[in-house]
């Protein structure tokens, strides 16, 4: 099974569908997908890190791997992008493929309660959400992304936490992401 080998051997929960696991168990598959997009003409490729944060990974019992999933996902995409640039240069061309670090909405909402009988209940705080996004953003930057892509978020508080985390990651960096 592609999902539950390597660091996930003996996982207590079903991991199929947790695509970020593939960054650690089958990086060659993820890289091949990036290369297909590049070969088709993509100038920007997204990392396989949409749910590589400890909140989303807690659904699978994989929260301890979230940072590693994000970093490795970025490094795989960076490698594919750099190889495309090298290949172009070998025939006298210049090509830049940008790597966008995918940051999804997490599996939890800060604005809505998952418990209809307790509308004030929230399983996570704003600070928890901020920490999840901060860890993910830092790992993506360290892995080599050019862009941080906060995507498909429907919850304004989740977006606010993500933007605060990304902004704080920029502090002290010479190069803006």
Predicted segments, located by residue:
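Domain-level signal for soluble alpha/beta catalytic cores
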Residues: 1-177
